[in-house]
């Protein structure tokens, strides 16, 4: 995964200008009034070629791939800092707000990489954030990489904060038995009436074993982790969520990123079900040499309905551009799902490409009144310029607000360069605060400042201009109906579909570290 800076800003309507600086952005939006705000920087890349020059080309002033989680008025985000060309970053950064995004405290996770406070590892990547209500502890899961013998993932670690996400302790080893772990994610059971209240679950795939799914469980606030368990399926990009009754549901892509499915545990992580296919994927390659794929973004409402969004071109004639589509669970175990529905950001004949969704669902809402927020990237027709947009729904996805442009006019060449293309992140994130606004976090960028450099490249490695920013929450306006969208698939699995989930021969062909 790459690093890029992030900024949080409230939504603007289409046509808004670029952010003042590249970065990671968080926004807060919902219907029906419009609000606009300016970007505020919440995190930086403190490194340079002199202080972090890994074995591969290293981008600086370049933070990428954010995740976030919220509890009450506290929002914690984590992201890569100093993205390295052939995998991972110099460090994992964090930004924490205790007042719904008004003020932020930022820093680097200690003792993870050799560039920060005595860490042992060469690189780190794939940060994911969770909160454990039983133990009142914040958790950030990270994948660490080593360079010797070729860059590869070697272990999953969990960093813990017991003071509301403001400072972080020495990371705890979660697992180091996989051949080459990738794409980790973390979640905790925060429902006091759940039989597994306080359980936390970390998911990843073992790229060195055909992208085999692995899960580990902690029952003590992330201090110790159990042995990995598996259902022997090939996956990538799983995002576990926990229902109020303690059932863990894990939406995921298959190892080849050609299908979206879900599996579950109803016994606190002791065993995991086979995968139910939600839908096959149709995907359009995004312009501009951008690193991007149809990985899922998943969340859950207050009653246990799971929502999963991904990039898909099935509704576009000739598959010439991508939409953001979604499906939601129709039963308590995630083994039945609604038809795939197009989110009506733009008309299906607009030619506008939409990709890398960051989905939020307000857990204080449920049923037909579930509130959904969606942050996403888009590129205008026949353009490689990147923009970031936001839309929301106050009725469980039946209708959606008019889209707002948060930032626009970013050249893909300003993004960090990696072996899999220019990168803003394999995923971005949105989280609802206690203000009932969806705070989205994403990477943004301006032109590098070194000499005549026009891209984040070998001539501008220390000046990629991608800091971490935030924005004051805003509110989206308007309403667009999705009721007449065509429906192509309503999957409930089946024996033929299970072939999609076979472990890939030899090493998995998809890895995103």
Q: What would you call each of these model-derived segments?
A:
Residues 4-35:
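Secretory targeting and sorting signals
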């Amino acid at each position: 995964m790459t690093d890029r800076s992030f900024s949080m800003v409230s939504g603007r309507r289409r046509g808004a200008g670029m952010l003042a600086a590249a970065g990671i952005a968080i926004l807060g939006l919902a219907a029906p009034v419009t609000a606009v705000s300016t970007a505020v920087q919440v995190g930086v890349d403190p490194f340079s070629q002199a202080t972090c020059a890994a074995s591969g080309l290293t981008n600086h002033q370049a933070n990428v791939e954010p995740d976030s989680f919220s509890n009450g008025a506290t929002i914690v985000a984590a992201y890569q800092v100093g993205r390295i060309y052939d995998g991972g970053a110099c460090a994992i950064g964090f930004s924490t707000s205790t007042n719904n995004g008004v003020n932020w405290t930022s820093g680097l996770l200690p003792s993870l990489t050799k560039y920060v406070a005595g860490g042992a590892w060469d690189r780190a990547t794939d940060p994911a954030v969770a909160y454990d209500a039983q133990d009142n502890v914040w958790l950030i899961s990270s994948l660490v990489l080593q360079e010797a013998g070729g860059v590869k993932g070697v272990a999953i670690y969990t960093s813990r904060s017991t003071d509301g996400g403001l400072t972080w302790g020495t990371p705890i080893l979660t697992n180091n038995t996989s051949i080459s772990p990738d794409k980790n994610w973390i979640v905790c059971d925060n429902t006091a009436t759940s039989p597994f209240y306080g359980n936390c679950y970390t998911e990843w795939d073992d790229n060195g074993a055909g992208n085999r799914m692995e899960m580990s469980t902690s029952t003590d606030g992330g201090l110790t982790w159990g042995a990995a368990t598996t259902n022997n399926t090939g996956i990538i990009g799983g995002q576990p969520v926990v229902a109020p009754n303690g059932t863990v549901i894990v939406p995921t892509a298959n190892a080849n990123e050609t299908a979206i499915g879900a599996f579950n545990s109803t016994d606190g992580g002791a065993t995991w079900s086979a995968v139910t296919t939600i839908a096959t994927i149709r995907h359009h390659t995004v312009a501009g040499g951008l690193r991007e794929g149809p990985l899922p973004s998943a969340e859950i409402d207050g009653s246990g309905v799971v929502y999963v969004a991904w990039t898909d071109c099935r509704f576009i004639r000739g598959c010439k551009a991508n939409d953001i589509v979604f499906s939601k669970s129709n039963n308590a175990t995630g083994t039945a799902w609604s038809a795939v529905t197009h989110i009506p950001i733009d008309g299906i004949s607009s030619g506008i490409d939409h990709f890398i969704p960051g989905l939020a669902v307000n857990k204080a809402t449920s049923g037909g009144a579930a509130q959904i927020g969606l942050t996403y990237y888009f590129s205008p027709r026949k353009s490689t310029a990147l923009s970031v947009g936001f839309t929301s729904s106050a009725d469980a996805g039946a209708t959606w607000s008019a889209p707002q442009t948060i930032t626009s006019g970013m050249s893909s060449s300003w993004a960090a360069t990696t072996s899999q293309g220019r990168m803003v992140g394999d995923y971005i994130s949105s989280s609802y605060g206690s203000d009932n606004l969806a705070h989205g976090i994403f990477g943004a960028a301006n032109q590098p400042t070194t000499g005549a450099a026009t891209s984040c490249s070998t001539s501008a490695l220390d000046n990629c201009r991608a800091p971490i920013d935030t924005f004051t929450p805003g509110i989206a306006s308007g309403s667009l109906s999705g009721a007449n969208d065509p429906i192509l698939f309503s999957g409930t699995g089946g024996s033929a579909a299970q072939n999609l989930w076979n472990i890939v021969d030899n090493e998995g062909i998809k890895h995103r570290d």
